[in-house]
């Protein structure tokens, strides 16, 4: 089957679509063509003409900049073929929901909305499932950055990191930053982490950043800042224990941003799917960190497998 992947070059969007296509490849042979929507090329320049078109196709992508391109492409291709063309939006578009054959979206996007019949829901974010055994002596810390969902307090985060490392002296830790991690925090991490012989800070721009997925899959302890839903659900899609790191003061009052990400993180905490590195405010204004462990009874999330199965079921029913 032909796949035309419309891309907006945002890492979180690309990783989720990639995880889904990798899973679909296990079910059906795919020929994938990527289309960079930021290049503003005309559809005839990037899509096959009537002499090149062969077989059914999937038009897929994530992000508001690509959804209109997917619908335009389907209309354009319909002029050249009677073959099936399936338009699939990954994440919830803000318009023309009924124009897509399928919408693959997180549950929190439809908690207070009517659920259209063409929507396939999943929990959190799409990530490849790993059943690799973990190394009980290894840990990973994944750091995001400022977002509209959380007040990213760098001082609190550094205190939390020192606490995590102090109570796990026998684990070998790798700390990874992200594109949103502030430069000042990167500098602090580099300078202060050098004091720990069992810790390595890996900057996003270094060649070793490619080891992130392998480290995530094989680490028994995974500590993640809650500002990045994608990072959290990537961790939960592998074996081991996942912990959210509190990054804002307990007295902080949130006055901006969408509630849905915070509600999603709170649900993970309440169901014990994740542990928490929290801050307790003692009398006298002393902040004390505390680690609460997650339940050990959960298997890795397999949301991408469920979504892939539903997509294949839909496509097969159209034949």
Model-inferred region functions:
Residues 209-211, 230-231, 242-244, 248-257, ...:
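Short glycine/proline-centered loop/turn elements that form peptide/ligand docking sites
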Residues 97-155:
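A nucleotide-sugar donor-handling region in carbohydrate enzymes
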Residues 5-122:
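Active-site and donor-binding regions of nucleotide-sugar-utilizing enzymes
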Residues 146-179:
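Conserved catalytic-core segment of nucleotide-activated headgroup transferases in glycan assembly
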Residues 217-219, 237-241:
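Conserved donor-binding/catalytic loop of nucleotide-activated donor transferases
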């Amino acid at each position: 089957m032909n796949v035309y992947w419309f891309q907006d070059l945002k890492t979180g969007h690309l990783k989720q679509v990639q995880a889904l296509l990798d899973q679909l490849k296990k079910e059906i042979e795919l020929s994938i063509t990527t289309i960079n929507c930021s290049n503003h090329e005309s559809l005839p320049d990037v899509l096959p003409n009537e002499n090149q078109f062969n077989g059914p196709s999937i038009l897929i992508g994530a992000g508001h900049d690509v959804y209109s391109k997917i619908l335009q492409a389907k209309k354009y291709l319909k002029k050249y073929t009677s073959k099936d063309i399936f338009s699939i939006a990954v994440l919830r578009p803000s318009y023309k929901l009924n124009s897509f054959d399928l919408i693959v979206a997180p549950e929190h996007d439809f908690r207070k909305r009517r659920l259209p019949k063409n929507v396939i829901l999943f929990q959190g974010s799409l990530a490849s499932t790993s059943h690799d055994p973990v190394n009980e002596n290894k840990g990973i810390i994944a750091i995001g950055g400022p977002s509209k969902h959380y007040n990213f307090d760098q001082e609190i985060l550094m205190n939390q990191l020192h606490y995590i490392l102090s109570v796990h002296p026998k684990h070998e830790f790798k700390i990874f930053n992200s594109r949103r991690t502030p430069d000042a925090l990167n500098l602090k991490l580099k300078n202060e982490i050098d004091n720990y012989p069992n810790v390595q800070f890996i900057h996003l721009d270094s060649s070793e950043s490619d080891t992130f997925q392998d480290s995530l899959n094989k680490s028994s302890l995974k500590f993640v800042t809650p500002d990045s839903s994608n990072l959290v659900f990537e961790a939960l899609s592998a074996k081991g224990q996942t912990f959210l790191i509190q990054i804002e003061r307990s007295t902080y009052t949130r006055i901006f941003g969408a509630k849905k990400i915070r509600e999603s993180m709170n649900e993970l905490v309440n169901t014990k799917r994740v542990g928490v590195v929290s801050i307790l405010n003692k009398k006298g204004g002393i902040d004390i960190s505390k680690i609460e462990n997650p339940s050990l009874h959960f298997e890795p999330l397999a949301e991408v497998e469920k979504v892939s199965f539903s997509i294949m079921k839909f496509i097969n029913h159209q034949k």
